[in-house]
Amino acid sequence: MQIKWFGHSAFMVEAASLKLLIDPWVSNPLSPASPQEVAAAKPTHILITHDHFDHLGESVDIAKATGAPVVGTYELTLEVAEKGIPEAQTMPMNIGGTIKLGDGVEVYMTPALHTANRGAPSGFVIATPEGTVYHAGDTALFRDMELIGELYDIDVALLPIGSVFTMGPREAAIAVQLLRPRRVVPMHYNTFPLIRQDPEDFKARVEAVTRAKVYVMKPGDVLKL
């Protein structure tokens, strides 16, 4: 398994024969790649946590270019269908549900404490034969993260730390205690001034109270398991 960060909340998770592109706002100011370059990498699926501009991003254009199915809440898949994605190219689901993508890869949709233009915000647990990844989406800290950690043996947690619109470093460090992942990658910070944070502060907080290893990635970096 490998996980590539494009800045903000955009990642490509590669496991088995699949390439899962998550929240592809790859035109963000930190991204090392253009939407065209990301499409050329041929993602097999596009997962969207909610429909705010910085998460929906270029998902429609990339889906049109690649034919990759779009995974999201029912309301979100209706929204991308209105933008020209065929209904047959969408995979609607809802919080608490699981879908199988093939090659032993399953996606479980988690709740997120946030807002959305349509439908509910969410996160994803991606369980694969090579490891399990939790992408929290945009969220505040919530106690049921402990249940997510009990349900899934999380190898990597991708957590927002920007504050203002999501939890900040202090709350995200508590989230790590609840989730009990082996590794943590901070996201959704320093893309613009309102969410400026020091990821090293988050790293110090987490590693002082848990056994999790924090990886402070730079946009374009790849984490291999």
Curated annotation (Swiss-Prot):
Taxonomy, superkingdom: Archaea
Any one GO MF annotation of this record: hydrolase activity
Entry keyword Hydrolase: yes
Keywords: Hydrolase
HAMAP family: UPF0173 (MF_00457)
Similarity annotation: Belongs to the UPF0173 family.
Descriptive protein name: UPF0173 metal-dependent hydrolase Pcal_1074
